[in-house]
A protein has these predicted regions:
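Boundary/linker segments flanking structured domains
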Residues: 1-52, 56-141
Length: 141
């Protein structure tokens, strides 16, 4: 039998398309410590209207994760919270949160996802550990 008669549902494409559609329809909010609900999900940060970081809140809540990012940015030079907005979607399932983060990163290729912005790497800041590009561009105050 030829492949033209076979049906294969491409779940990842359908999931990504629906997630991005819902995500882009969600409102943008100023990045503050209380912007999001205490639920799990996915989010993106925008600087001056440009999507710069996509992440997930799984072991913590969207509220805590976005508050952590707001505090980090507020404590840096060359950037301010006035420049920042965010979008988020609440998602209950661990699998869908992980898949959602992957879909956002793959779809948007955010610059800060490659610079160490959201890093929780053990040893960061210790002697002998190189500073991330993000820490170099936006040093602590």
């Amino acid at each position: 039998m030829c492949d033209r008669h076979a049906f294969f549902f491409e779940f990842d494409k359908a999931f990504t398309r629906q997630l991005i559609e819902k995500f882009e329809a969600s409102p943008a909010h100023p990045l503050t410590e209380e912007v999001a609900p205490p639920q799990t999900g996915v989010y993106a940060l925008y600087r001056r209207g440009r999507l710069v970081y996509a992440g997930k809140a799984l072991q913590t809540t969207l509220q805590r994760r976005l508050a952590e990012h707001a505090r980090k940015i507020a404590g840096r030079r060359n950037i301010s919270l006035d420049q920042m907005t965010c979008r988020f979607l609440t998602i209950d399932s661990e699998w869908f949160v992980r898949a959602g983060e992957h879909a956002l990163i793959k779809s948007y290729n955010p610059a800060w996802n490659r610079t160490g912005f959201g890093s929780h790497v053990p040893g960061r800041g210790r002697p002998g550990i190189r500073r991330s590009r993000w820490d170099t561009e936006f040093p602590p105050r």
